[in-house]
Amino acid sequence: MEETRNCQNCKKDFTIEPDDFGFYEKMNVPAPTWCPECRMVRRLVWRNERNLFRRKDAHTGKDSFSGIPVEAPIQTYETSFWYGDEWDALDYGVDYDFSVPFFKQFQDLFHRVPIMAKSSAGFMINSDYCNEAGRLKNAYLCFDADFIEDSAYLVKVTNVKNSFDSHELVDDELCYECVMVYKSYQTFFSLDCENCVDVWFSKGLRGCTNCVGGVNLRGKSYDFFNEPRTKEDYEKKLADMDLKSHATISRIRAEAFAFWQKFPVKYYHGIRNLNCT
């Protein structure tokens, strides 16, 4: 029988299904007192990649940017010093005490041993405001990023140049406001596209060039909202759209999003997978 409980954190009601109780009994754990949403927040709070704080470096005493809040009882070292040979984490070693719970000892050790102020690797040139990143040059507010150059406001990106305001890009250049775009060039306001060039307001394209508002196209060129055009007609229509205007961009983006809703949505994003759901 399902049971409704009140979350001790957000105070909203949530339901525990009969199958859930069976699972808790099997795992020999009590039923949750927090709702699923609050439990998810609690799990995710361990990893902070996008919030930066100004805190004192434990070695130099100077201010530095860090992914660790100032109030956290942890010592941080600037990344290059942390990687260096001037200190040794083994110096903080202690004997294990079998009379004290493991996690209490682990917590105490974690609070004593300095950690990196920001998580980064390789060269970081003019990219102080980035975290969980490596091999960046002239990057600003890029997170979970690797091999990025002349870009800003990116999350979960690899090998990207001259791109802004996007999430999950790989092997891209000159992209703006894109999500899940791979191996593409000059792609704007688009979602789930790969191997594309000069694409605007599109979704689910593969190997396409010069498309506006396309959905689920393969190997197409000079398409406007899934209608094929001649090269001359397409270029004239594109020139008449005045894409330098913010009002025009907002209008066409809304039209494209409404157009997207008319097409089936892929239930699963993945390739070369076996027995996966």
Could you say what each language-model-derived stretch is?
Residues 1-277:
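Long, distal/terminal scaffolding or interaction modules
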